Amino acid sequence: MKTVQEKYAFSKSEIKILRELVRGERSLSDLRKKLSFGPSLLSYNLKKLLDKGLIRENTRGFRKYVQFNDSKHASLLKNLLLVYYHIDWENLLVGKGLYILFQIISDFENSFYGVSKATFWRYLRRFRTHGILQKKVNKYEISPRFSILADFLNEYQLFFIKRIAEKLSSEAVVLWHRDFEFLVRVPKTVKVTSEKLHLTATSLFPSLGLPIFSEYNILFHSERKKNIKIEDAVLHTLLIERKNVRYVIYSLLLLHKYKEKIDVGYLKSEAQKYNLGVQIVSMLSFIETHSRQGDLPLPTWTEFEAKAREYGVTV
């Protein structure tokens, strides 16, 4: 079975077809002639672009035509190819190039897992030659001049994430996503068979001795993470709604209940990846000092004590 990364990847042939479509609808015969593609090669690549939600087909008389789809990610890619037509996207958005860009738009340190150093530096040179990437502190980021590229990457990623979620349930709601990892809320009746989906956040609380129940389950989709630790459950609970004090209290209850077992180093490291570093430090301090710091969403100690009694947590 293909990974998500393999499904979103572009080939040079796909980019060449898309370049032809930026100025309008084309017939299949026109594309074959213009690109020197045989019928089977053209058909194969059109099928992949259809699956990516980027194009649509229609038939008039005996001729079949293709054009860009009206979906948000398709419109953004069309504009990107049109505005920056002079850039050789065939050598930038193919292979590991797109994979590297997806990691760059993630809000944490560029680790570039799954990419050899030689491959990374090869693509980095290409991106920087065109001014697409710039370095800020110890991270690479997409230049503001290419904000349309960043917008496309975000929407393209969300397209695939929503597709996975919708296959789970028509009632599935994506709560958070980053680099093809995401949290999704589904009805408890949904049966999960994929090893890439893990029960997490408040849905794990009952098994951890905290009687918090819901008619929905929170699942974490990841192609890298094999199991969910208590620290992960704490962070995923915060990600449900970052500024909601209710979820902060739930996370605090779990942190306090297992404070002797929590791997603080792992917790802080993972928190940085989710832009929750400051929040976690404040929560750990809150547990130790019983007082709030700054304007972060934290309860008063009295409020926390009341919730702790309600859920049977000794404070």
Summary of predicted features, one role per range:
Residues 30-36, 107-116:
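A short acidic, leucine-rich amphipathic alpha-helix
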Residues 50-60, 128-138:
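A short, conserved structural fragment
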Residues 59-65, 71, 136-147:
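Short, Lys/Arg-rich nucleic-acid/phosphate-binding segment
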Residues 72-97, 145-180:
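Short, amphipathic alpha-helical interaction segments positioned at domain boundaries
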Residues 158-231:
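Short gly/ser-rich loop at a beta-strand->alpha-helix junction or flexible surface loop bordering the NTP-binding
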Residues 213-315:
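Hydrophobic alpha-helical interaction segments
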